[in-house]
From Swiss-Prot:
Residues 3-143 form the Resolvase/invertase-type recombinase catalytic domain. GO terms for biological process: DNA integration; DNA recombination. This is Serine recombinase PinR. InterPro entries: Homeodomain-like_sf, Recombinase_CS, Resolv_N, Resolvase-like_N_sf, Resolvase_HTH_dom, SSR_resolvase. PANTHER family: DNA-INVERTASE FROM LAMBDOID PROPHAGE, SERINE RECOMBINASE PINE-RELATED. The keyword Plastid does not apply. GO terms for molecular function: DNA binding; DNA strand exchange activity; hydrolase activity; ligase activity. Belongs to the site-specific recombinase resolvase family. The lineage of its organism: Bacteria, Pseudomonadati, Pseudomonadota, Gammaproteobacteria, Enterobacterales. The active site is at residue 11. Gene3D superfamilies: Homeodomain-like, Resolvase, N-terminal catalytic domain. It comes from Escherichia coli (strain K12).
């Protein structure tokens, strides 16, 4: 026999899950108190980072039903929601979202809804990649360097090159500049083959 669970999440400590519990009960779902999982955590946290949700996942079995009042209870964004619903569906768990009319997200109508959500998730991901790429291009155009700051500045690199030309050992130069031999060898290589 299938069991019914509810997941109620609130973001701040001054909120309660009472409204969500009432909404679930008003929709006709009778859920045992021990099968209502409540969590006080930010909605920006992915479901994988939610301890209460992870405890719920460990308890759910094939044939069980999960009730949420809103879709955002299942993830922090469209991609996370899609991943969560897919994970639950693969396990054989039916997911009902009351904000979508109590629709079972694993039913044909629910699957269509999830395809729309998947399209939105893909669109979100593409926008994020596009913004990231344009931000990197803009930063590089403004002369922004990426990665760690160089160990040696240009003046120090010239001194290193002069020391190498005068026969000082790589190890001695590395000790003088308090850096590794590899850093000195990289500086030497760059000065011998300047950027074209």
């Amino acid at each position: 026999m299938s069991r019914i669970f509810a997941y109620c999440r609130i973001s701040t400590l001054d909120q309660t899950t009472e409204n969500q519990r009432r909404e679930i009960e008003s929709a006709g779902f009778k859920i045992k108190p021990q099968q209502i999982i409540e969590e006080h955590i930010s909605g920006s946290a992915a479901t994988s980072e939610r301890p209460g949700f992870n405890r719920l996942l460990a308890r759910l079995k094939c044939g069980d039903q999960l009730i949420v009042t809103k879709l955002d209870r299942l993830g922090c964004n469209a991609m996370d929601i899609r991943k969560t619903v897919e994970q639950l569906t693969e396990t054989g768990i039916r997911v009902h979202c009351l904000a979508l009319g109590g629709i079972d997200l694993t039913s044909p109508t629910g699957k269509m809804m999830m395809q729309v959500i998947s399209a939105v998730a893909e669109f979100e991901r593409d926008l994020l990649l596009e913004r990231t790429h344009s931000g990197i291009v803009r930063a590089r155009g403004a002369g922004k360097r990426f990665g760690r700051p160089p160990v040696l500045n240009e003046e120090q690199k010239q001194v290193v090159f002069e020391r190498i030309k005068s026969g000082v050992s790589i190890s001695a130069i590395a000790r003088e500049f308090k850096t590794s031999r590899q850093t000195i060898l990289r500086a030497k290589a760059k000065l011998q083959t300047p950027d074209i």
